[in-house]
Amino acid sequence: MTPSEIHADERLVHVPLGERAYDILIGPGLIGRAGGEISARLKGRRAAIITDEHVAPLYLEGLMDGLQTDGIEAVSLTLPAGEKTKSFEHLVTVCDAVLSARVERNDAVIALGGGVIGDLAGFAAGIVRRGVRFVQIPTSLLSQVDSSVGGKTGINTRHGKNLVGVFHQPDLVLADTAVLDTLSPREFRAGYAEVVKYGLIDKPDFFFWLEKNWDDIRTGGPARIEAIATSCQAKADVVVADEKENGVRALLNLGHTFGHALEAATNYDSKRLVHGEGVAIGMVLAHQFSARLNLASPDDAARVEAHLKAVGLPTTMKDIPGELPPVETLMAAIAQDKKVKGGKLTFILTHGIGQSFVADDVASSEVQSFLSEKHPG
């Protein structure tokens, strides 16, 4: 069988990774066609669907029906929603469910959900039988443009976010844009922060386009699919150039060093801060820190902050509800960042909008002094 033809309102992004190459399909109605798209690409006839309690009532039945129609026998596991599900405890639960479903190497684990479910299910797919097929059906904007693409999987520990995991590329990504209409405005904005990130890394024209087209993206106009496709292509290009994050892929972590520290500081409490909001604040801080180090103009930092604020995203630590722990606690979280090498702090800094770079010898004293100025305490 061959994959179905791309519809007029869809986009396809191909990720050319040799034997591990895969397609990202972007457009409305893809969940209903998932069975056909999967069966056209994978030999296996079994699947284990991993989802969460928020997504399951909306899309699980439709996905199961579609798989059955195309001859794929599927079972499902529904987990609690939220960042705390990315744990060893739930990883064991997922692995047990996949093995109980008798999923073999040519069969598939299907992640139906946002980034949490994708990271967790992908980790399980990477280690069960030393690797089974994996299909991402991301249901949030953030997961459609970021976490579903590139093969990073993992869980959180008490030491920090995403510190235990494997690289396991998906075999197919189905980004059904129709599901985005069910997201809360807050969740949609949080995902949009990752869209902005691609412009700030090395695509200034994309950032300027986003400034003009945010309203059309928000309301589901033609710019929405264009923004998602551009983001997926940007990430695919980086992943192909540096799959295992030994070089340029680290640029995708713009805003994430500060952001992850803030997530840890709020104990991953989504009522206070969700991942995309942490990234938004982190990107502003990265631009401000770059300006402080005389690497970039303060005007660029102000422009980034202005756009994110206009969208409705938090842009300062003061925007986070509740008290934050002291700067020393934030510094301890930063010291656990995956990009730390030889004990030296590594940040993604910038020379301006669309001019990000890896700075691999940042003085901790400079970071601590900067955070002390920005800390609301």
From Swiss-Prot:
One of its GO terms (cellular component) is cytoplasm. This is 3-dehydroquinate synthase. GO terms for molecular function: 3-dehydroquinate synthase activity; metal ion binding; nucleotide binding. It comes from Agrobacterium fabrum (strain C58 / ATCC 33970). It is an enzyme of class 4 (lyase). It is found in: Cytoplasm. Binds 1 divalent metal cation per subunit. Can use either Co(2+) or Zn(2+). NAD(+) binds at residues 115-119, 139-140, 152, 161. Zn(2+) binds at residues 194, 256, 275. InterPro entries: Dehydroquinate_synthase, DHQ_synth_AroB, DHQ_synth_fam, DHQS/DOIS_N, DHQS_C. Pathway: Metabolic intermediate biosynthesis; chorismate biosynthesis; chorismate from D-erythrose 4-phosphate and phosphoenolpyruvate: step 2/7. Its EC number is 4.2.3.4. Keywords: Amino-acid biosynthesis, Aromatic amino acid biosynthesis, Cobalt, Cytoplasm, Lyase, Metal-binding, NAD, Nucleotide-binding, Zinc. Its cofactor is NAD(+); Co(2+); Zn(2+). It comes from the Bacteria.
